[in-house]
Amino acid sequence: MPSSHPLPPPELRDCPAPAKLNLFLHVTGRRADGYHTLQTVFQLVDWCDMLHFRRRDDGVVARVTEVPGVPAESDLVVRAARALQAATGTTFGAEIAIDKVLPMGGGIGGGSSDAATTLLALNHLWGLGLTRPELMRIGLTLGADVPVFVLGQNAFAQGIGEELTPVELPDSWFVIIHPKQHVPTAEIFSDECLTRDTPVSIIAVFAARTNKFDFGRNDLEPIATAKFGEVARALAWLKQHNQHARMTGSGACVFARFPDAKTAQQVLERLPPEWDGRCVRSLAHHPLAAFA
């Protein structure tokens, strides 16, 4: 229910929407409705889109920046704001600007993270007072990856990705490579060669491991690398520097962990010029965690 607390100032600027990495991703089955059941661990990192919000009193939700290839009406940010309106009956609206830096079709959750940041920021800006579980339920209607960003912690995920258990992960540095190739998620999941029967893992087994970054595999990786040559080449290059390099999500981004920022930066400096790369640090908590 909407909160009776005084409203904050009408504008929220520089609200981060962090990327995620899938440390592993196992496809364990397929439900009758066609959704795949998964197990994965989500790692948040400090590579972020930045969103800016201005409260409106007329109920209008308007995206005021262009996002190439994404019409405003289908943007998860706009849909998240309207889902929050529908769930609460608030009469407030918002103007939303997005500084988009996370690549689309990269497997790092950019659109889902933008939606979660919208839910968290507008929960605060509109004075709604919804709890984190309430926001997570709204987020799930927008996409299976949205709830983990609302949860705001690294997590072991099951089901279609919505059954979340927080996990402690060590402070880490990663190199992420985007091979400038868009990988359609639906195409990967619909491939007849996709492994769909990986045995179920137990969270305690993962949690007890000293090295949590060489656990399991990404079941989507063989499909994506067979279909998209640049993804395969980027992964092969990164494996020269860390044999446990792997793809995140359904691609196209690949990543590897390194012992410190200096080592990660040295690897990044050798990156072939045809790809984009980034040295990132792990996050233990979402920057907007206090908004729910």
Curated annotation (Swiss-Prot):
Its EC number is 2.7.1.148. One of its GO terms (molecular function) is 4-(cytidine 5'-diphospho)-2-C-methyl-D-erythritol kinase activity. The keyword Cell membrane does not apply. One of its GO terms (biological process) is isopentenyl diphosphate biosynthetic process, methylerythritol 4-phosphate pathway. Keywords: ATP-binding, Isoprene biosynthesis, Kinase, Nucleotide-binding, Transferase. Belongs to the GHMP kinase family. IspE subfamily. It holds the Pfam family GHMP_kinases_N. It comes from Cupriavidus taiwanensis (strain DSM 17343 / BCRC 17206 / CCUG 44338 / CIP 107171 / LMG 19424 / R1) (Ralstonia taiwanensis (strain LMG 19424)). It comes from the Bacteria. This is 4-diphosphocytidyl-2-C-methyl-D-erythritol kinase. Pathway: Isoprenoid biosynthesis; isopentenyl diphosphate biosynthesis via DXP pathway; isopentenyl diphosphate from 1-deoxy-D-xylulose 5-phosphate: step 3/6. The gene is ispE. Catalyzes the phosphorylation of the position 2 hydroxy group of 4-diphosphocytidyl-2C-methyl-D-erythritol. The active site is at 20, 145. The keyword RNA-binding does not apply. It catalyses: 4-CDP-2-C-methyl-D-erythritol + ATP = 4-CDP-2-C-methyl-D-erythritol 2-phosphate + ADP + H(+). InterPro entries: GHMP_kinase_C_dom, GHMP_kinase_C_sf, GHMP_kinase_N_dom, IspE, Ribosomal_Su5_D2-typ_SF, Ribsml_uS5_D2-typ_fold_subgr. ATP binds at residues 103-113.
